[in-house]
């Protein structure tokens, strides 16, 4: 999935062939892809065609075949290869795409050694890792925190704090579990630990942080 994300970001003209049933697309699709290069044809219908061109596929670029978990797409990609197309299966399918985080370095603020962004194109979400003096804060972590842990290890830092900038409407935060596993604080604004409709307080332990307060991290302050 990371390789595909980088190729799309670079503007490569790829065809995305999603072989799931149309109703499954609501769970997520590979994007951003121009409409004319996104094809949704169930695999059983596609392999019944005499010519893949009947499905609107052209041979002017790689065809990336997508299914739920990367099994059906392997068979379709093999069938397309025999038919003369440059076809590849997306490893892990849309499930892997939705969970993938793509790390990239950003300009580093004063007092910090690294600022790493985690782009999650499947969710349209971003996370971060701030590093200073061997200490790191993981921000807006997904339920799959391995990329944050890997990047911290790569730059020789230890995650000493976890934070969420807000309660996320489109995914479940991995912040509480990561903080608990590392035995470090999980920072959150107190207003985000209250159910907005009836004021019921949340049950997760957290460290409150509000505007005007700061968190010390190595040589820096957030």
Residue ranges, per PLM feature:
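Catalytic cysteine-centered active loop of the rhodanese-like fold, especially the PTP/DSP P-loop
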Residues: 41-43, 49-95
